[in-house]
Amino acid sequence: MITYFHFMALSVLSSFLVSTDANTKQTVTININVPQETLMDEQEVFSQNICKLIEYINSKGYKVTLGEAYRTHEQALIYAHEGLGIKNSLHCERLAMDLNIISPEGKLLCTIEEFRPFGEYWESLNEYNVWGGKWKHRPDSDHFQMSDETRK
């Protein structure tokens, strides 16, 4: 008889294979550690990528100030009700950030075309990075997020 037990311990999924020998009735336990993506792991990668994006933007002569990063679930519901966002925003998971980008001439960037080079760079950093300026329904040019697909 073989039984598997699983439990989460920080960022490692531990599997215990428990086998009972039919002849001796002795139980043998084998501990197997398998890497598992966690929200904290994703947040760390997201944060590192945001730093790379800001450095890239600065290297082109632009300045950056931070927009909204964290959003409570309550605030997400309010925004969704007002048509200004969605109720399951990745801001709530700390996997999305809005950036204000200022040109070398001091102009706040607003259009998708102005943000495009930075959005393309963002998406090149990680296969799960998504730039809001590419969305068909209600594009959001200053929005940068990391999809949570790795945990699904």
Model-derived features with residue positions:
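Acidic/histidine-rich, surface-exposed loop or edge segments in extracytoplasmic proteins
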Residues: K25-L39, I101-S103
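Secreted/periplasmic proteins that engage bacterial cell-wall peptidoglycan
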Residues: E44-K87
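N-terminal secretory targeting signals
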Residues: M1-I32
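A generic structural signal for ordered secondary structure
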Residues: T3, V34, Y56-Y62, I101-E105, ...
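Catalytic cores and adjacent binding grooves of peptidoglycan-active enzymes
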Residues: I86-K152
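Second-shell loop/turn segments in exported
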Residues: P35-V45, E105-I112
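A generic short-segment signal for beta-strand/edge and adjacent turn/coil regions
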Residues: I32-Q36, K63-R71, E113
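Solvent-exposed, well-ordered amphipathic alpha-helical segments
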Residues: A9-S15, V45-Y56, N100-I102, F144-E149
